[in-house]
Swiss-Prot record:
This is Putative ABC transporter ATP-binding protein LMOf2365_1216. Keywords: ATP-binding, Cell membrane, Membrane, Nucleotide-binding, Translocase, Transport. ATP binds at G35, A36, N37, G38, S39, G40, K41, S42. One of its GO terms (biological process) is cobalt ion transport. PANTHER family: ENERGY-COUPLING FACTOR TRANSPORTER ATP-BINDING PROTEIN ECFA1, HEAVY METAL TRANSPORTER. It comes from the Bacteria. Residues 2-237 form the ABC transporter domain. Pfam families: ABC_tran. SMART domains: AAA. Belongs to the ABC transporter superfamily. GO terms for cellular component: ATP-binding cassette (ABC) transporter complex.
């Protein structure tokens, strides 16, 4: 269990970044965290990783208030991993397998287990075809997959994804969505922070909407986006499938493929 209860956070310069924020990562399998720039999404990620301690309120990990000791934070970060928007921020080795194996080797895991776990996570993210390529020859999307593999190799339970589809072409976005859904089907809990509203709508089963460091609203994804006034208040726009439903009278579809199947059109 990973959640926050009524947390607030103020930076040293006096800026209030979060105010009375409560989120529960058990609310869904793939949870969306949305809001305009400066709404507190990145700061909230840092709270969930124990990097910053709340000024008020509590972060709960595995049913207990998070203790900010070295031992407690080590345990937290073995189970909660982040993948940054820019994969170059967390890829340090020139070889894919060595990079993914880094954390395990640093922990003294046997080489036999290292090889087995690295192979497993590379398969999960579809990176086996380029596992022996030098990192500098990988595409941006391939680097993102390597970064996810590096986060998964510790057998993390919660995965925090910062803008997972940013900078990807349509095929790369499709592959990333498939990876996220595959991880969720395998029992991983995923929190996605993204400005890609259509991605959030299609892939997430629960959404928290932030505005000025507070939770403006939260709930099942379709219900959140159907409330146009809240979406606009947060400085966002509705997903196109929601607009089609409300403005053109189409049935409400959650996935693009379902809409095109309904209209008899074919999409890749």
């Amino acid at each position: 269990m990973l959640k926050t209860e009524h947390i607030s956070f103020q930076y040293e310069d006096g800026k209030q970044a979060l105010t009375d924020v409560s989120i529960d990562l058990e609310k869904g399998n793939i949870i969306g965290l949305i809001g305009a720039n400066g709404s507190g999404k990145s700061t909230l990620f840092m709270q969930l990783l124990g990097i910053n301690k709340p000024s008020d309120g509590t972060v709960y990990f595995e049913g207990k208030p998070l203790a900010y000791t070295k031992k407690a934070l080590f345990a937290l970060r073995k189970k909660v991993s982040i993948v940054f928007q820019d994969p170059d921020q967390q890829i340090f080795y020139s070889n894919v397998r060595d990079d993914v194996a880094f954390a395990l080797r640093n922990l003294g895991v046997s080489e036999t287990e290292v090889e087995a776990r690295v192979t497993k996570v590379l398969d999960i993210v579809g990176a086996k075809d380029f596992q022996h390529k030098p990192v500098q020859y990988l595409s941006y999307g391939q680097k993102k997959r390597v970064a996810i593999a590096g986060a998964l190799v510790l057998d993390t339970d919660w995965l925090l994804l910062d803008e997972p589809t940013a900078g990807l072409d349509p095929i790369g976005k499709k592959i990333m969505m498939e990876i996220i859904e595959r991880l969720a089907s395998q029992g991983k809990k995923i929190l996605i922070s993204s400005h890609d509203i259509d991605l959030i709508y299609e892939i997430c089963d629960y959404v928290y909407m932030l505005k000025d460091g507070s939770v403006l609203t939260d709930g099942e994804t379709s219900n959140v986006f159907l409330e146009k006034s809240n979406v606009e208040q947060a400085g966002l726009v509705q997903p196109w499938l929601i607009k089609l439903h409300q403005q053109a009278g189409y049935p409400l579809f959650k996935k693009e493929a379902d809409f095109f199947a309904h209209t008899g059109k074919v999409t890749n």
